[in-house]
Amino acid sequence: MVNLRLQVAVVGAPTVGKTAFVQMLHSNGTTFPKNYLMTLGCDFIVKEVPVDDDNTVEMIIFDVSGQREYEPMVSSYLQNTAVFIVMYDVSNKVTFEACARWVNQVRTNSKESVGILIANKSDLSDKAEVTDRQGKDLANANKMKFYKISTLRGVGITEPIDEIARHYVDAYQKRIEQLTQMR
């Protein structure tokens, strides 16, 4: 049995749904926050993600404020981050345009981290200002995986986290095999 620990940062412009996403993960999809409270600096949760009968990944998930006034502190939250999630609101093009800045900021502070791009608020598709193609193109250009979710509806919120956990366990097992063969 393997228990691995992993640091994940969720970043993006204000009001894209980062806090709601993290809170939904924490409650296993049962509690959508009814009131919006701006994240001050950074909040975090610890989430255990079972991968199979033998492996679990404990994720320390940081919900990083998107407010500019907290930007000087953001780099300290991003250090040692193995995975980063950049989130935008499909109904707000400005939040999508901010994604490139977030990707650059994370990669400056944590060069080896794996990136995921999440298009949130898919329940607002009738008001979409960003197409799926635009999201996928941005993800591909930055070597990131792309997911489309609705935190409000609880649709797709576990897929990115489950994928991260599976990828992390697979990478760990491959590394163990490599080290074993070196003997």
Swiss-Prot record:
Keywords: Cell projection, Cilium, Flagellum, GTP-binding, Nucleotide-binding, Protein transport, Transport. It comes from the Eukaryota. Small GTPase-like component of the intraflagellar transport (IFT) complex B required for both anterograde and retrograde intraflagellar transport. May be involved in cargo loading of the retrograde transport. Belongs to the small GTPase superfamily. Rab family. It is found in: Cell projection, Cilium, Flagellum. One of its GO terms (molecular function) is GTPase activity. It holds the Pfam family Ras. This is Intraflagellar transport protein 27 homolog. Component of the IFT complex B. InterPro entries: P-loop_NTPase, RabL4_euk, Small_GTP-bd, Small_GTPase. GO terms for cellular component: ciliary basal body; cilium; cytoplasm; endosome; Golgi apparatus; intraciliary transport particle; motile cilium. Its main location: other. It comes from Trypanosoma brucei brucei (strain 927/4 GUTat10.1). GTP binds at residues 12-19, 63-67, 120-123. GO terms for biological process: intraciliary anterograde transport; intraciliary retrograde transport; intraciliary transport involved in cilium assembly; protein transport; regulation of cilium assembly; small GTPase-mediated signal transduction.
